[in-house]
Design a protein with these regions (language model features):
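Active-site mouth loops of central-metabolism enzymes
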Residues: 61-73, 139-146, 189-193
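Conserved phosphate-binding/catalytic loop of the ribokinase/pfkB sugar-kinase fold
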Residues: 133-158
Length: 228
């Protein structure tokens, strides 16, 4: 048994002070007053806060590395860096780029997911684009924006569809409904973003299965008194 000893532990209903966390085979068995148990492995945290790790669902890069490098080495360095800041898993997030660059990035993520052992775990890919509205492209490259369609999605991800966990898409572009329904039916979270959609169109998107918003208030139209 492993014991994380003497921590300030956050649970859903509040904080427990001077507490020990008992672990077996990577799972929490119990949280008890400090000193109640000894383990084969003891990690003394001496009054530090102990919380569940963060899951980052939108990260393009860090530590001088970028998901679009298309490099396993870059992803490994990212994973080590974010682990030091409390993130235990993340979705490697692409930008709206060329087919070749996107495929190279997906290939690298696929490779690291098979063998990764250090740092935060990469649990899949978040595709930010290319199915977005050019009016709200933000930092995305307009020349690589594509109409939403199952064919374009299939061409973009190729054999790596299985690692795509999340995609940012504008509900107000051609083909958005059909592609959204396909993605949701295949277990991929569809998030509204980079959109000039009206309130009514956003409600339609929710009805199709869109369930999140990407960097809310950024890359979208401003609120107006007659167009909320």
């Amino acid at each position: 048994m492993k014991v994380i000893k003497g921590g300030i532990v956050y649970q859903g209903d509040g904080w427990r002070y001077n507490a020990d966390i008992l672990l077996e085979n990577g799972k929490i068995l119990d949280i008890v007053p400090s000193g109640s148990y000894e383990g084969e492995q003891v990690v003394n945290v001496d009054g530090c806060y102990v919380c569940p790790g963060f899951i980052d669902i939108h990260i393009h890069g860090c530590a001088g590395r970028d998901v679009m490098d298309g490099s396993v080495e870059s992803l490994e360095e990212m994973a080590k860096f974010v682990a030091g800041h409390g993130t235990t898993s993340f979705l490697a997030t692409t930008t709206t780029s060329s087919l070749e660059a996107t495929r190279n990035s997906l290939k690298a993520v696929n490779e690291i997911m098979k063998k990764q052992s250090q740092g935060a775990q990469i649990i899949g890919v978040h595709l930010e684009g290319p199915f977005i509205n050019s009016r709200a492209k933000g930092a995305q490259a307009e020349k690589y924006i594509l109409p939403a369609s199952r064919d374009n999605f299939a061409e973009l991800v190729g054999e790596y569809e299985g690692i795509v966990r999340r995609i940012t898409m504008a509900p107000d572009i051609e083909g958005a409904q059909e592609l959204t329904e396909y993605l949701v039916n295949n277990g991929i979270v569809v998030s509204m973003g980079h959109t000039a959609a009206s309130y009514e169109k956003c409600i339609e998107g929710i009805e199709w299965g869109m369930s999140h918003a990407t960097h809310f208030y950024n890359a979208m139209t401003p609120l107006k008194h007659r167009e909320p």
